[in-house]
Amino acid sequence: MGKIIGIDLGTTNSCVAVLDGDKPRVIENAEGERTTASVIAYTDGETLVGQPAKRQAVTNPTNTLFAIKRLIGRRFEDEEVQRDIEIMPYKIVKADNGDAWVEAKGQKMAAPQVSAEVLKKMKKTAEDFLGEEVTGAVITVPAYFNDAQRQATKDAGRIAGLEVKRIINEPTAAALAYGLDKKGGDRTIAVYDLGGGTFDISIIEIDEVEGEKTFEVLATNGDTHLGGEDFDNRLINYLVDEFKKEQGIDLKTDPLAMQRVKEAAEKAKIELSFTSQTDVNLPYVTADATAPKHMNVKVTRAKLESLVEDLVQRSLEPLKVALADADLSVNDITDVILVGGQTRMPMVQAKVAEFFGKEARRDVNPDEAVAMGAAVQGGVLAGDVKDVLLLDVTPLSLGIETMGGVMTKLVEKNTTIPTKANQVFSTAEDNQSAVTIHVLQGERKQAMYNKSLGQFNLEGIQPAPRGMPQIEVTFDLDADGILHVSAKDKQTGKEQKITIQASGGLSDDEIEKMVQEAEANKEADKKFEELATARNQADQMIHGTRKQVEEAGDALPAEDKEKIEAAVSELEDARKGDDKEAIDAKVQALMTASQKLMEIAQQQAQAQAAQGGDEAAQSKDDDVVDAEFEEVKDDKK
């Protein structure tokens, strides 16, 4: 079996790691960075990912997509999506199935399709390092992701050409990376994961028995729409408001200006983790009829903290719930681990330390721990790591809608996965021949307030008085946290396997089409790279040949010179076209025409080398100094 890589598909940044021996190793990308910006840009005929995409965002804001993870597996009408529509420079549109999609360069795309571009870069990064094709991956998701979001993440992996061996929760992955080589017996850890777009808290117990470690998640909670992007947006709004007060101009109507403000706000936020104040200075940020306008706003750490205090406070509520669900108090927690870039903010660190009554560990890299843990899980699945057992949980309860619009739970939240649960239901009316089973995920008693995962009809029920037919519904929750449902009519013994067709999400046909498009693009990218290489080779050949012709001078016969000039001219024409084979053929033709030239160049080089040797010898002779010696007599010694 080939290597199974671990990928942290983040809102702001992504990271890829692989098990190197018995230790996880983060792999640097082509730009030499250990993390890759989760930014995708569509330009004329090219798709950019990572830093190259980020660099051109100011001049191409409407076609530069970021924080796509906030949309993955979400419906267009979701409150969180509607909030994002107000602040994102790119278009968020409603798909035919009601999902939140994006639009760039006039083309509508699903969130998994866009995220697949980041995964493709992660895959390529790993392949370049390993020197072999990679097909298997463990991809991390926020612990509080629901079924639709997990399924959409798996879809993104499939579109990127990866077989997703396992979906693993981010805090659990961080705990794996942290606890793998820790000695000293059992411990109960709290992983506080505040990333670019999502927040999770997981309480995890690490037990060690005879060298085998068990990582058991006791409880998890979180908020899938709280993260560094929200902190950025608070600062962006403050800067825009200050500018409006001073200049009377609303920058929100100017996408180019807003992109510059966004970048400046991100930079200022990071700086304020290490300094008490910073200046946001943007010359020529916009202009009106009178003159160009410049932004110059001083921001203190105290000001930033006042802008985001409620966001930090919002992250503390799930901590209380998770501890209560695990039936623990803060005194039972032995270690606190901070994961996610936003945890570098001093205020976040202070509030978490205050809550748990202890400082967080400093020996965990918040940007890399999740990918490293995913790589460890990849090693477990590949059979390379044998002394680790991971027991994760489902973050939300699962059930169905029953009479009166009530949600009846079959699987309670924080149940260890994989798991199976069943319950017998019946009909609500006499002689009912079919029932609609509406599958839900969430904690509310009222069905309408929970997440709808889809519904299906079970037909062919034999006519009988209400309450008589017995329909056994089975929920099968796999290790990825994804739900499969089956139903059985107990009277007839006939069983039906049912795949939930959620009202949203991508169909198999849509995914297959996107996979084929990705493959086609891969082929096109490969051809483009080969053509660029051929053109570069042609350029070097033309330049080198002309230089040699000049150096050969009269030593090159006129007939050969004409042949070479004709071949150079033909190669220049071929280089302008898109036919790699034609360029290669003309390069070969020029090499053939230049044989005499090569001989002359070689002779000249040999003559030059010989002349250089003679000069060196002469120079050595010139360095000899004549001196008079006096014989030393023995008695003078």
UniProtKB/Swiss-Prot annotation:
The keyword Chaperone applies. Gene3D superfamilies: 1.20.1270.10, 3.30.420.40, Actin, Chain A, domain 4, Substrate Binding Domain Of DNAk, Chain A, domain 1. GO terms for molecular function: ATP binding; ATP-dependent protein folding chaperone; unfolded protein binding. The modification Phosphothreonine is found at residue 198. Keywords: ATP-binding, Chaperone, Nucleotide-binding, Phosphoprotein, Stress response. Belongs to the heat shock protein 70 family. HAMAP family: DnaK (MF_00332). This is Chaperone protein DnaK. The lineage of its organism: Bacteria, Pseudomonadati, Pseudomonadota, Gammaproteobacteria, Vibrionales. The gene is dnaK.
